[in-house]
Amino acid sequence: MENDKEGKYVYDYVSYLYRKGIIDLSEVIEKVKSISDNKNLLTNLISLEFVENYENALIVKENEDIKKMYWSRNVRLRISDKAEHRVFIWALNECKKYGSFNTYLELLYDIKDKISVQELYKATLEISDIKSDVASSMTDYYLEEIFDILQQTFIDDDEKCAELATLEWMCRNVLEWEHMKCMQKIMKDDPTFYALLVSIIYKADDNENIDEEKRKLANKVYSGFDKAKFCPTEKDGEVIYENLKKWIEKFKELLINQKQERLFGNLVGRLLAYSPIGEDGYSPCEAVRMVIEEYYTDSLKTAYVVAEENKRGVHMVDAGKSELILHQRYQKNAEALQERYPYTADIYFAISDNYKREAEYERKRAEDEL
């Protein structure tokens, strides 16, 4: 070992012999301890074991430092196929105590089919007690897969759904909005949390002084607020007018209490743009059209137009052909709504006109480049 200070050759050799079943790993580890204080090598060797019975697992006998190194490693835990259910629970508890956010999440993903959904729920909530480290390239995938199981099971359980929504929010910098289904439900059902975010991010009407602490908090929550793109009260592609009106009225009342009523039209327009289509095949759905007609303002219109156009995202430049198609599509939509929903139609005419101007601009630019 004098010529192998890192222990790489020793590890490779022992690993080969162990896989062949030639050596007793515990004896090798004791021998290594007697001639070296290489903790990394020791941890590597212990990690070769497939744990079947945790009472006899090699890692159980080690000190706190080795346990922290073992459970903090980005190497998949090796648990024998013969292991009992309690071994997986033991592993979770040990990893929570000694490991990192990433190794705990990785382990939770690996054993999600080995434990009950109730145990998975409980173990997932405990993520909030673990100090987060730098997200790995797989963090978002693990979270999405675990949350998907829990969301499908507990979305209609108000208490558990609220707990999961809190955890989704904690992971907002990793999860995309479409994977934050419990938070979506919370916001769609009631405007209280959304209004709370507004109170943190925006100033009140009385020109309140913003201290450094509130500015930092606003910066922390803004990314999550910006991700929140939803139509209030929408469920399974349907919006009921009475429910939507109740949500809108409560939201307005909350803004008034927060001295932020001036933001009402802008915020509502931003959300209503995410309405499902109507039964007649045109956008937005009938309930949203009725609300727009009732609460229409210039700020609502502007916010709706911006949100709708932002949905397009990145697109190919094709001399204005795509923009011309969009102009015609939105114009047709507006004309279908014009008689019964004039304010809503006005919004769609505005979007249509914007794309018409953009189509003309792109066409001329393409001609100039020839």
Identify the meaning behind each predicted range.
Residues 13, 74-75, 267, 326, ...:
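Structural register within alpha-helical repeat arrays
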Residues 1-309:
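Non-catalytic all-alpha helical scaffold/repeat segments
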Residues 355-369:
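Amphipathic alpha-helical coiled-coil segments
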